[in-house]
Amino acid sequence: YTSIQNKITGAETETKAFENAGLPFIPAFLRENPEILTSNRFDEAALIQPGDIKGIIHCHSNWSDGSHTIEQMALAAKELGMEYLVISDHSKSAFYAQGLFEEKVLEQHRYIDELNEQLKPFKIFKSIESDILNNGNLDYDDSILARFDLVIASIHSNLKMTEEKAMMRLLNAINNPYTTILGHLTGRLLLSREGYPVNHSTII
């Protein structure tokens, strides 16, 4: 271990560190697999490549707390060879992120319709990151939720809770017929905030 550590110290890139250690490069997400580490090989062809990705989901624009316009984001996605973009700005409960109230949702949808006409066959999907409230309800009425192509449901408030409370909120959100995706399931913020406890098996 010490001899390998000495070889990789000061390497400018991960690839160079592996090269210095006399090992084939192994992507970070595969390094916890003991079989791959001990065999020093893996099937690179089996990995998802950039060209396999057809679209980008869960994007915030400058309509809420994002930095760029929807048009800028769509054009950038097109340049990357993407076929679609899912705009999922923050919902109205996320006041700290300029979340969208109902009238802004309708305004944004009209704007997306215009962009889709200009950019077709590229497609911008209408989405929202809807807050899961303390009782597990989403923060829009069904009449608004029904207007989205897909809804990402996320917990952003009251994060310090028991597993029982967390599961109640998450399962209520899942049972909402308009929920498509759960966002950041445990609320964990890497290196700065622990997640709340959940029963992954039950959720799956």
Question: Each PLM stretch: what is its role?
Answer:
Residues 1-49:
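Acidic, metal-coordinating catalytic segment for phosphate/diphosphate chemistry
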Residues 148-158:
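Aromatic- and acid-rich polysaccharide-binding/catalytic face
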Residues 32-133, 158-159, 181, 185-204:
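An N-terminally biased module of ancient metal coordination in phosphate/nucleic-acid-related enzymes
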Residues 161-163:
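Short, charged, surface-exposed secondary-structure boundary motifs
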Residues 78-79, 140-148, 172-178:
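Acidic (Asp/Glu)-rich catalytic clusters
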Residues 134-144, 170-171, 193-197:
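Distinct, well-ordered alpha-helical segments
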Residues 165-189:
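C-terminal, non-catalytic macromolecule-binding modules
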Residues 106-109, 138-150, 203-204:
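Short, electropositive alpha-helical surface patch
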